[in-house]
Swiss-Prot record:
Residues 1-25 are annotated as: Disordered. Catalyzes the removal of a penultimate prolyl residue from the N-termini of peptides. It catalyses: Release of any N-terminal amino acid, including proline, that is linked to proline, even from a dipeptide or tripeptide. This is Probable Xaa-Pro aminopeptidase pepP. It is an enzyme of class 3 (hydrolase). One of its GO terms (molecular function) is metalloaminopeptidase activity. Belongs to the peptidase M24B family. It comes from the Eukaryota. The gene is pepP.
Length: 501
């Protein structure tokens, strides 16, 4: 299927390059137009998701990558899913989270499973737990072999009691065959005796590389997660008019996701009111809302192990204060301009640098920064207000594979980037600039003569209560541009309209 056949929303509609009408009838028409577009998008990605998760196609891609470094590779890829593990000092199981490497080649989200993929024949064998009569009493019948074969993109399904005999048989099919597995992810009772060699490094690296470029099914999964999360973000804005605490809004987000069959969060949600928004990964989510200017919500659900990662900032009083609007406009400009520069092969470091340039221009216009823009950039003073990276890969993990970060970079502007270098077409990335007023971060800059000459402390004092503003979308990189997978509102007129209702 052509990718664009199920992604009808183009850059013009999703990057909000057209200013919506602002009043009465025209505004109503605009809102209905966006609703119709979103409905069309839902229908399209739902159609894609009716197919099986493409585990075998992923396995073939992984084999191709293995053979780039090992041209004569043959044998078996053996992967295990997450095994059931009890809570410490308890007889209940830990919350289940499937191993992503196993899921990538199977689409199977069951515990205690395994996969054997024969490289020569491209045959995929899924192993599922046998029926335990004692467990059936409590949990009901598990998935049968026939049901698993119908549900998953595999050639054969067996019980896990057949793992060792099957591996022995496959090993004997070709001399000097190799078993490719992941270190510390093989059960003690599994043996590789008949294989000529064992490789515990190559397949993990190959899967990490393969996961960077998403196929149409994976993009549809991320889009579905985004659709549900965007609905939940809107629900939080609506609920904020009557809520008294961050906790109530946290509950609203969870309720909306769970009610749409997405109970798993991609990460611990952040709901930070007022100055708490200056803490990048604020986790308390329990402070009162009264007297606070804004709420920053960074939250996203998973859909079948694929993440969304969305951040919005909105006024708690229905309308941004002057200072909050000042900062919001800068961050929105940072986000839009960086998004417009995205296309396959672009260098992420360049986008991050551009975001800092936009931030510096905006803060100079407000008088928070003073002096020459180039000198401020060269001194890295803008890192006092924008201390994190512009974004990261997104997929089965919120901070997905392939980012190539360098936490030891001597340049503080790039040290915290989770994504570096060229970004290929097909990747999904976040674009999440922000400006923050964190005393802990900014004070050392004010005490340092290298930076203090560029910061007007008197003007800065007007902005502490803003806390922080971050805006984050999930972007699918294409050969010549991008597709924005996030539909949550972010234009000031839209945000204030929903906040004020």
């Amino acid at each position: 299927m052509n990718y664009h056949s199920f992604l009808p929303l183009r850059r013009s509609s999703l990057s909000h390059s057209t200013t919506p009408p602002s009043k009465s009838r025209n505004q109503t028409r605009y809102i209905w137009s966006i609703a119709l577009q979103n409905t069309m998008a839902v229908e399209d990605f739902e159609a894609v998701l009716k197919a099986k998760y493409p585990g075998k196609a992923h396995a073939k891609r992984v084999v191709d990558l293995i053979r780039k470094t090992k041209p004569d590779a043959n044998g078996v890829i053996y992967l295990e899913g997450r095994m059931t593990k009890l809570l410490e000092d308890n007889d209940s199981p830990e919350p289940f989270r499937q191993r992503r490497f196993f899921y990538y080649l199977t689409g199977c989200n069951l515990a205690d499973c395994a996969l054997a993929y024969d490289i020569q024949s491209s045959k995929s064998i899924l192993f599922i737990p046998p029926i335990d009569p004692d467990d059936v009493i409590w949990s009901g019948l598990p998935l049968s072999i026939d049901e698993a074969l119908s549900r998953y993109d595999v050639d054969e399904v067996k019980f896990t009691t057949e793992v060792n005999p099957t591996l022995t048989h496959l090993a004997k099919q070709s001399p000097n065959s190799t078993v490719f597995a992941i270190a510390n992810q093989v059960s003690d009772n599994v043996t590789f005796i008949e294989f000529g060699s064992k490789d515990f490094e190559t397949v993990k690296k190959a899967i990490e590389v393969s996961r960077v470029v998403k196929d149409e099914f994976e993009v549809a999964m991320i889009r579905k997660a985004n659709h549900i999360s965007s609905l939940a973000h809107k629900a939080v804005i609506e609920r904020s008019k009557t809520a008294a605490t961050e906790q109530e809004l946290y509950a609203t987000f969870l309720e909306r996701c769970v009610s749409h069959a997405a109970p798993e969060m991609a990460y611990h949600p952040i709901l930070a009111a007022g100055k708490a928004a200056a803490t990048l990964h604020y986790v308390d989510n329990n402070a009162p809302l009264k007297g606070k200017q804004n709420l920053l919500i960074d939250a996203g659900c998973e859909w079948n192990n694929y993440a969304s990662d969305i951040t919005r900032t909105f006024p708690l009083t229905g309308k941004f204060t002057k200072e909050s609007r000042d900062i919001y406009d800068i961050v929105l400009r940072m986000q839009k301009e960086c998004t417009e520069l995205i296309k396959g092969g672009m260098i992420w470091d360049d986008l991050h640098l551009h975001a800092h340039k936009v931030a510096i221009d905006g803060l100079l216009a407000l008088g928070i920064l003073k002096g020459d823009a180039k000198e401020i950039l060269d001194a890295r003073t803008s890192a006092a207000f924008f201390p994190h990276g512009l974004g990261h890969h997104l997929g089965m993990d919120t901070h997905d594979t392939g980012g190539n970060p360098n936490p030891n970079d001597p340049d503080k502007l790039f040290r915290y980037l989770r994504l570096r270098g060229h970004v290929p077409a097909g990747a999904v990335v976040t674009v999440e600039p922000g400006i923050y007023f964190c005393d802990f971060i900014i004070k050392p800059y004010l005490d340092d003569h290298v930076h203090s000459k560029y910061i007007d402390a008197a003007v800065l004092n007007k902005y502490w209560d803003v806390g922080g503003v971050r805006i984050e979308d999930n972007i699918h990189v294409t050969e010549n541009g991008y597709v924005n997978l996030t539909t949550a509102i972010k234009e000031v007129s839209d945000v204030e309209a929903v906040s004020a209702k």
